[in-house]
Amino acid sequence: MELRTKTLNIQPPKKPFSNTYQAFVLEKKNALGKNFDNKKVQADYNKLSNNEKERLQKLVDNAEEKYKEELFHYNNHIQGKGKQKYVPQVKVPEKPKKPIGSFFRFLEENRQKYAAKHKDLTNAKILKIMSEDFNNLPQKEVKVYEDAYQKEYAQYLVEFKKWNEKYGQAAQKKQTKRKNSTSKSRRSSSKGKSSVSKGRTKSTSSKRRADSSASQGRSQSSSSNRRKASSSKDQKGTRSSSRKASNSKGRKNSTSNKRNSSSSSKRSSSSKNKKSSSSKNKKSSSSKGRKSSSSRGRKASSSKNRKSSKSKDRKSSSSKGRKSSSSSKSNKRKASSSRGRKSSSSKGRKSSKSQERKNSHADTSKQMEDEGQKRRQSSSSAKRDESSKKSRRNSMKEARTKKANNKSASKASKSGSKSKGKSASKSKGKSSSKGKNSKSRSASKPKSNAAQNSNNTHQTADSSENASSTTQTRTRGRQREQKDMVNEKSNSKSSSKGKKNSKSNTRSKSKSKSASKSRKNASKSKKDTTNHGRQTRSKSRSESKSKSEAPNKNSNKMEVIEQPKEESSDRKRRESRSQSAKKTSDKKSKNRSDSKKMTAEDPKKNNAEDSKGKKKSKEGKTGAYGKKANKKQ
């Protein structure tokens, strides 16, 4: 419902009753009126028969169909989105479809049969076979399919007419809306990228226009004020000029009237009455002249003022037009200059701000870099201090371990020499009980003392070898500790907690390593002492047995042992001491050869004596060979 100017405010249709009970209640309300009771109506509804309920159901269905048609008509004619918010939109039903042709009917009926016959073939080949069979069918069978098609087609036409009458226009509108929406979406997608770039330029241009409009408004207001002031001045000037012109003309007219009056008075007056006539004429002429001049001056001044005002108005209008045009041009020039100045000033401000921001960013970045360098330097100096402290600690620990190893080696050598002397005294005391073997062993006794002296020299050499081996193990331990330190530094960068744990672990590792090294060195020194004691005993026995057979074998065996290379002065001292010890041992052996005899002892006793000697060496008893070994190390 549309008019020339406005649309009618059509209200949406109301929903009808949706149940049979509601339809029954409406009928009773219309019939009973004021005497309506809910309880009685409910009882009557429960007593209704099936036929009456079917009648009410038909009423409900018809009411729903009418409501849908009215609502659809309302939605097609209404305008404005605000009203469509509370109105539910009715969906347009689909078009009625055309029926299937005769060939497709034949396919629907016989497709399964052909598929069961030809299982190995594809669908395309099966369709070819069916089309050939359909073309070969007789006309009677083909007419059956065509008649069914024509009946359904007649029904289709009737349904399509009904649908087109109700929903044809709405369906066309929806199709056009969909097409427009798709085209708009494509255009928006294509222009989306350009709109982003144009939006920025539009925003800047709109700002410039606003600035120019503000400046133009100010200039127009100032020009209008100037025009008002100039018009008021022109009006005042015209009034003052008209007054001046009237005054000057009045004076001229008065002078001419005086002359005329004087000449006329001379002609008319006689000689007798010259004085009286002249005085009277003067007074009358002056009064008349004044009156006539004032009246004439006023008329002339009014007419002239009108003409002058018109001419001045024309001139002023033309001058105003010229001024307005010039002022408009000047305003435009001023606006353009103000725009240029503003744009240049805004650009300069923006550029200055951007430069200030860049400078501030550069300053902050420099400050951050300086702080980072300071932190790095402080961290590197701290790491260097820590590494120097650790190296000092490790050197102190190594010196302590060296001292402990030297002490343990010296004690072991001294305990070995004393244990040998005690074992020899015990063996001599037992030699008196044994008879036959004493003579043979007494003969080999002086050489056993020499062998002991030679073994003592070998002990010193072995102790020096142990010292060299300990130095090698220490260097390896240092290398391992350095590797551990490097690994700890790399791990310390990962986390502060890892640093603390790594430091504690390195300290515990260094302590455990130093303790384990000291233990190993002590155990090595103990083993060396026991091995030397066993070797001396075995060598003394072998010498006593092989004295008669090969006296030079022992000397060859002794020469096989490699001694460490030392200085010539140390060698001479050792040789002199060994020779003096041999001489003393030979003298003692000659004096005691008859009384003292060596006896064979079990290995278990020897081991027990060795253990006693080790204990005494730990207690701190030192000998000559032990002091010498410590000096060399």
From Swiss-Prot:
Example of a GO cellular component annotation carried by this entry: chromosome
Keywords associated with the record: Chromosome, DNA-binding, Nucleus, Phosphoprotein, Repeat
Disordered: annotated segments: 170-633
Basic and acidic residues biased stretches: 353-374, 382-401, 478-491, 540-550, 559-612
MF GO annotations: DNA binding
Compartments, as annotated in UniProt: Nucleus; Chromosome
Leader sequence segment: none
Low complexity: compositionally biased ranges: 212-224, 253-271, 406-416
Biased composition (Polar residues): 446-469
PANTHER family, alphabetized: CHROMOSOME UNDETERMINED SCAFFOLD_121, WHOLE GENOME SHOTGUN SEQUENCE, UPSTREAM BINDING TRANSCRIPTION FACTOR
Protein name: Micronuclear linker histone polyprotein
Species per Swiss-Prot/TrEMBL record: Tetrahymena thermophila (strain SB210)
